[in-house]
A protein has these predicted regions:
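Alpha-helical transmembrane segments in multi-pass integral membrane proteins
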Residues: 11-12, 23, 27, 35-53, ...
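Residues within membrane-spanning alpha-helices of integral membrane proteins
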Residues: 55, 59-62, 101, 133-140, ...
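Central hydrophobic cores of alpha-helical transmembrane segments in multi-pass inner-membrane proteins
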Residues: 98-108
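Alpha-helical transmembrane segments of multi-pass membrane proteins
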Residues: 122, 126-139, 198
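Extracytosolic (periplasmic/ER-lumenal) interhelical loops and adjacent juxtamembrane/interface segments
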Residues: 157-174
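Function-critical hydrophobic alpha-helical transmembrane segments in multi-pass membrane proteins
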Residues: 174-198
Length: 407
């Protein structure tokens, strides 16, 4: 944590030093210098890059997703019996992604809110766009080309819904190659709502609102299940029915700023308790979900899973030196987590019930997924992120010049 905070404040400190060097060459009164110090303060360079174990957890999550789609590699009775349980490990993987997203985004927003007293919404949305849109729309364009050539089955409604990040609310959504975008839709819809709420409500009220939503979310799911039967197949795919999973991560980020809460939760993280959570997450929850479906997931299943993953996330962040933490922070594991977004996007054309490319060999399929994801990361994601950083730096320099001109 300390390393993360030092890195997050190093850029502002450097910019502040540069500002002081500029100001020191100009004769000014004490009042004027004080005014300049306020006006010229650069934007904080915020990052969550060095939070330990998160990339490793992303890697575990994407492994669960790929494994849940790999039922075709099994044969006969093994395939029929294992598919139902493995399918829910894909749900588990996505749930971990949701909790991590809520935690990371809130952590980033809180650091800006604490540093500047506000949240630059335009800046936040631009940064999210550079992070998410390039790889997503390249994948969507690729599917569009294949669809026009008759190589994949797709509908116009599903394609438009994916393009507008509303696939998860389109009741007639179809087509395997876009069947995984529902989780990306939830995250994008969440990104639109949560920063606005946090800016309006502030940290304390925002936490209270998040907890209230978590408490009423099971009721919302039950009502949706009972009174919107056409959307029952999307019960776990809509923002209003899964927002509590993201909010568990948000609440953890806010509460982690309270030393007394951190101390209490650290005491709770006893090996026996953590072992029980792992048994529940990896064994009990998938079996109950497979056995009872929405009757378990809607009133209690998603809530228990989100809460359990949040505590395990807290443990992984707080104890990176533990055996689990050391594994999660191994370079190959972390790298898989870094490219997990591209893996998630492109695995759909190689893996699952209707893959575009069916190799018949699981090892070759995994290799193709990794090679495609690496290409997507280095050719699409990294250049977009470099461009985003250059624009950030240019914006910072422009802001500094404008503020100096005010003097």
């Amino acid at each position: 944590m300390n390393a993360m905070l030092q890195q997050q404040h190093s850029a502002p400190a450097q910019a502040e030093t540069e500002r002081q060097n500029v100001v020191s060459t100009q004769p000014a009164s004490q009042d004027e210098t004080a005014r300049i110090a306020v006006v010229v303060r650069p934007k904080p360079r915020l990052s969550t890059r060095n939070i330990p174990s998160l990339d490793g957890l992303r890697a575990i999550s994407i492994i669960f997703v790929i494994a849940s789609h790999a039922h075709w590699a099994l044969t006969g009775t093994l395939s029929r019996s294992a598919w139902r349980n493995w399918h829910y490990y894909g749900v588990l993987g996505v749930t971990v992604f949701f909790v991590i997203s809520g935690y990371l985004i809130t952590n980033l927003l809180l650091k800006e809110l604490d540093t500047t007293g506000s949240i630059r919404l335009k800046h936040f949305y631009i940064r999210r766009a550079f992070r998410i849109f390039p790889a997503f729309y390249v994948y969507l364009a690729f599917i569009g080309v294949l669809w026009s050539m008759g190589l994949v089955q797709q509908t116009l409604g599903s394609y438009v819904a994916a393009f507008t990040y509303t696939w998860n609310y389109y009741p007639y959504a179809a087509g395997w190659t876009l069947g995984h975008v529902w989780s990306l839709c939830i995250e994008e819809q969440f990104y639109l709502c949560w920063p606005l709420l946090l800016l309006w409500a502030g940290k304390v009220r925002g936490l209270r609102i998040a907890i209230c939503i978590i408490l009423v979310a099971p009721f919302i799911r039950v009502v949706t299940y009972e009174f919107a039967p056409v959307m029952r197949g999307h019960l776990g795919m809509m923002l209003h029915t899964r927002i509590d999973t993201l909010l568990f991560g948000c609440a953890l980020a806010v509460l982690s700023q309270d030393p007394s809460f951190v101390a209490k939760l650290r005491r709770l993280c006893h090996p026996l308790f953590l072992g029980g959570l792992l048994v529940f997450v990896l064994l009990v929850s998938p079996v109950l979900s497979a056995r009872f479906g929405g009757s378990y997931d809607a009133p209690i299943g998603f809530t228990l899973l989100g809460a359990s993953i949040s505590i395990l996330l807290f443990y992984c962040i707080q104890w990176p030196e533990s055996p689990v933490g050391r594994v999660l922070n191994l370079w190959p594991v972390r790298h898989l987590g870094v490219i997990s977004y591209s893996v998630y996007l492109w695995q759909q054309i190689f893996d699952g019930s209707q893959p575009l490319i069916h190799t018949r060999y699981l090892g070759l399929t995994l290799l193709l997924i990794l090679l495609t994801a690496e290409a997507s990361y280095w050719v699409i994601e990294r250049p977009a992120l470099r461009l985003r950083r250059r624009l950030d730096q240019r914006s910072d320099r422009l802001t500094m010049r404008m503020n100096l001109a005010v003097r």
